[in-house]
Design a protein with these regions (language model features):
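Active-site loop segments of alpha/beta catalytic cores
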Residues: 1-153
């Protein structure tokens, strides 16, 4: 599988209005993404910040062509809007990875798996790279995946 990854640092909610996003930001990005999709490349989009107001706009691609990696987006809403066409991943807060308790980490991961894992297409991961993660929190994340992160037929 060949993949192109994009770090989207300026498209987040609050950086520009929805009208500005749809006029200036999205058309050129979509044109590049469409070209790579035509070449058979999966698009991995790291949407830094919240993309809650952008979800309907970015849901314009063929099924299986895009994985959206979210930092601070409502994942249940992202699953509802994008889940039929796109994979989604992320949204375990770096602050939780670094300063949370293993119990809080496991509970948060379980919630994400239960909200987003139904029907497939969800990858549990941190929302961004965490500096100095607590090893016990990473273990709790793995435990949550082992306990709750499987697909039932």
């Amino acid at each position: 599988i060949f993949m192109v990854t994009y770090p989207l640092h300026k498209g987040a909610d609050g950086w520009m209005s929805q009208k500005q996003f749809e006029t200036f930001y999205w058309p050129s990005l979509k044109k590049v993404m469409d070209a790579f999709i035509r070449e058979g490349l999966i698009q991995n989009m790291f949407a830094e910040g919240g993309y809650n107001t952008r979800l309907e706009t970015v849901n314009e691609f063929p099924r299986g062509a895009v994985c959206w990696y979210f930092d601070r987006t409502d994942m249940a809403r992202a699953k509802r809007i994008l889940g039929g066409k796109c994979a989604i991943q992320g949204n375990v807060p770096s602050s939780l990875v670094v300063t949370g308790t293993p119990e809080d980490m496991k509970a948060h991961c379980r919630k994400l798996i239960e909200e987003c894992g139904k029907g497939g297409g969800y990858i549990l991961s941190a929302g961004a790279i965490a500096e100095n993660p607590r090893p016990e929190n990473l273990r709790a994340m793995v435990q949550a995946v082992n306990e709750y992160g499987f697909y039932r037929k």
